[in-house]
Amino acid sequence: DNCIWAYSLMGIWAYDCGTKSWRTDLTGIWSSRPDVIIHAVAQDIEGRIWVGKDYDGIDVLEKETGKVTSLVAHDDNGRSLPHNTIYDLYADRDGIMWVGTYKKGVSYYSESIFKFNMYEWGDITCIEQADENRLWLGTNDHGILLWNRSTGKAEPFWRDAEGQLPNPVVSMLKSKDGKLWVGTFNGGLYCMDGSRVRSYKEGAGNALASNNIWALVEDDKGRIWIASLGGGLQCLEPLSGTFETYTSNNSALLENNVTSLCWVDNNTLFFGTANQGVGMMDMRTREIKKIQGQSGNVKLSNDAGNHVYKDSRGLVWIATREGLNVYDTRRHLFLDLSPVAEAKGNFIAAITEDQERNMWVSTSRKVIRVTVASDGKGSYLFDSRAYNSEDGLQNCDFNQRSIKTLHNGIIAIGGLYGVNVFAPDHIRYNKMLPNVMFTGLSLFDEAVKVGQSYGGRVLIEKELNDVENVEFDYKQNIFSVSFASDNYNLSEKTQY
């Protein structure tokens, strides 16, 4: 943008060479502030200005908008600045910003390293969106937290008359009328409407069939469908408080442990079970049947259906205890995505779709992005990319069905340590090819040295990186070459 940036201990200024004038929009940010001492300024690969300060961390300026983001040290966050006094800043050709601190050495930052933000709110078992800025977080041992993403605060959302929190929270649903429905383990079902709370407990007759509520969905008539462990499948009419109950005793329900629910269309409800695979109910007839696929077709990787999810193409994604499957409702076929998604034998916890129609799958200790394309023959092609704690994810298991795509496209995933939040379209990848350097050559496990004779011949007359080629005779047939790169962007994931 043709600006000259000047700074001293007392401030920072920018001279616009185009208008031949000093920029006035920086006044009040750093200049003329006696409490701010500036030690370093650098511009990153995205054009942002980084300002290193004394005892006050780093400010990052978006030049187009004037927005300033502050980066400071946090003792409880190992990914924050190590120290708040910054003596030097340097942006290298790979987009890495190097930071020299007063007493904590040198650190570096790259957007392609940590792709996922982490918030340590405890064991997050389910997620629902309250409004544009707030999320309800169901927890294993702290009830429901209302997390305001604007303020960063998460506070208990509701306690009963005795001051108790509903624990553990397993499922949540915001119905079309704005009520929050909460399913718990061994605590029944709650309906929260502002300050009014109604509870449903297991009982005889027209009542909740089980206090263990694993999944909740709403139909087009405003009825709440309930999946429970031990109680089968129920439909609650909220106005009358009456239940329809479907169990293995009074219907063709596969078993009474129902784990997950999803609508394929207004007339078809798919459900997962703990041990009997996936079934469906026809809403018009209430007929229930097991999803088998065509004879001879691929079967489910496991009959434990942890999560059932329908995408925008009409494909039904099924997370099981030992892999990932897709059911093509048009062709009535099961597809096994476990090998493609690096998920074979893995416990698949939860599934969601982003606004670009990519699928995101959480497993034990990693998250997988699956891209879907048409093969031009009526079927699909799948590809995947896996992420783990080295990308910023929590280093623990993710929870079943604890995933949510928010209205703005951001995805939240719950695990044992908290919630990871990310914008799929903001994930950055390192596109710079690193320099590869040869670090050693061995012959019969003996290091080859410059100018030294082996078998009557000198193999390398100068340093290995300056050699065009190396020739061995046919008897010198056991050798090894070692090499490395200057890549600091997740170097452990570098492929050669």
Where in this protein do the model-derived segments appear?
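Short loop/turn segments that connect beta-strands within beta-propeller blades
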Residues: 16-20, 62-66, 110-113, 148-152, ...
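Short, structured interface segments
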Residues: 96-113, 420-422
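Conserved beta-propeller blade signature
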Residues: 3-6, 48-50, 96-98, 134-137, ...
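Residue-level detector of Asp-centered blade-edge/turn motifs that repeat once per structural unit
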Residues: 1, 43-46, 91-94, 129-132, ...
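Loop/turn residues immediately N-terminal
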Residues: 10-13, 54-58, 102-106, 140-144, ...
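Residue-level "micro-hotspots" composed of small/polar
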Residues: 23, 29-37, 71-87, 104, ...
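Fold-core signature of tandem repeat domains
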Residues: 49, 61, 68, 86, ...
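Beta-propeller domains
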Residues: 272-276, 302-307, 312-313, 322-325
